Amino acid sequence: EFANIIDDEDYECGLPIAIDGTNSGVQHYAAASLSATDGEMVNLTNTERPQDVYQRVADNALMKLQKISDKVDLDETILSLYPNYEGKLRSQAYRDRKKTFPELARLWLDYGVSRSTVKRNCMTYGYSSKKYGFSDQLVDDFMKPLKDKVMRGEIDRHPFEDVERKAASFLAAINYQAIEEVISSVADGMEFFQATVDALSTENKAMRWETPIGFPVVQKYTYWNAKKVRIFLYDRVAMVEKRSQITVRERDENKIDRKKSRSAISPNIIHSMDASHLMSTVLHCKEE
């Protein structure tokens, strides 16, 4: 194939070309909600140059970090990130956050926040990833690799030494808010899906839908009933009786697990759309 390409400029190459979508989760939400703004950010519309949704989120996060570092409207910013502190401004927990937030913001600004810093958070947001999930991702993607570099002697010290988990949790909250503000169709879509599941769960019904290629999907998460059973075992070697406890779980097929259904509905629907897109592409290639 390569030789023919070099020798013949009119040769039609048959080698497969890998094509990657721009955050397919957001693409599906933008398309379903007919959001022209979000659709443009993930390259669903024709633009003069490719759009970069990750950079937009990074820019938003950087703006927030700079604002916190400069202690501009700090109370308002903290409450927007953690609404549960409303009415608790005199609590020790709140005062601790107010003291450490500017320090953590400065650490991230010194380290640098780019599109790669927010990319994984952006990609999993539409699949119901929450702040604690974002935090775990930042630990895996940045804190642990930085610690490994220190161990190998590649860098002198960890940029977030002694505050790795706090720094990850802090940026996770910043990224979550930035993503919500930049990609509004995703939040609206997830809210709609979860409201639908809530309504069905109230009537103890499973969620059902059909994908664009006609594949029927049923989401039915039911509760588990758990019972703890004490057992007595005789150890022949030690010649003693041992006590133990086991948990026996049995699924209740007649009661929908509302909490599990809420957390699973968005990723399940988007994954089913991803699968349909892949299958449609394969079928189209076969027809061509």
Regions found by a protein language model. Give the residues of each.
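Conserved catalytic core of nucleotide polymerization and phosphodiester-bond processing enzymes
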Residues: 1-288
